[in-house]
Swiss-Prot record:
Source species, domain of life: Bacteria
EC top class, as a word: hydrolase
Gene Ontology BP terms: riboflavin biosynthetic process
Note accompanying the cofactor annotation: Binds 1 zinc ion per subunit.
The protein, known as: GTP cyclohydrolase-2
């Protein structure tokens, strides 16, 4: 994989002004973004998140998943902490793409869960790759991470690429009546680390 740094600009948000760093995977043509806030230290643990693109959740306010809620919570947590990063990776639909994601949603509307829908379309449950994170983190100067995630695959990927995960910070937000079954499937079939408290909450 060849990751090329392209440019950096300011990104004003409701939580403060982030810096937006653009990267291109010259082999696949995919474009990725790193958001940074404050001053990042290579010597100290930095609060951060690896976030895969979710057009429906991040931009269209879908309640079928928790992605948009997690992105906003991560940005708010980083701003409140005073520094941090988000790697926004272009891996829509756990790597199957937007149109296939819509096809998977159609199958879910007919009763399949999120894993079954992917498999019925001929895909693995999760096809995301994380080999781009190392060169991006090197560019923004991060070596030690407090990682906001419920996904053990992201923790494993960080460690495999030589990035120290000092702490896993749970990010359990956004549960509602439309996504509760989806979240339970992520917990039971994809191994996401969610507490029973998250499912006992009756605020839907």
């Amino acid at each position: 994989m060849s990751i090329k740094y392209v440019a950096t600009s300011k990104l004003p948000t409701p939580w403060g002004v982030f810096a937006m760093h653009g990267f291109e995977d010259t082999e696949s043509g995919k474009e990725h973004v790193a958001l940074t806030f404050g001053t990042l230290s290579a010597d100290e643990p930095v609060l951060g998140r690896i976030h895969s693109e979710c057009l429906t959740g991040d931009a269209l306010f879908s309640l079928r998943c928790d992605c948009g809620f997690q992105l906003q919570a991560a940005m708010q947590n980083i701003a409140e902490t005073g520094s941090g990063f988000i790697l926004y990776l272009r891996q829509e639909g756990r790597g199957i793409g937007l149109l296939n994601k819509i096809r998977a949603y159609e199958l879910q509307d007919k009763g399949a869960n999120t894993v079954e829908a992917n498999e019925q379309l001929g895909f693995e449950a999760d096809m995301r790759k994380y080999d781009m994170i190392k060169p991006i983190l090197e560019q923004i100067g991060v070596k030690h991470v407090r990682l906001m995630t419920n996904n053990p695959r992201k923790v494993k990927a960080m460690k495999e690429f030589g990035i120290e995960v000092v702490e896993r910070v749970p990010l359990q937000v956004g549960k509602n009546r439309y996504n509760e079954a989806y979240l339970k499937t992520k917990s039971t079939e994809l191994g996401h680390m969610m507490s029973e408290y998250h499912f006992m909450d009756e605020n839907k």
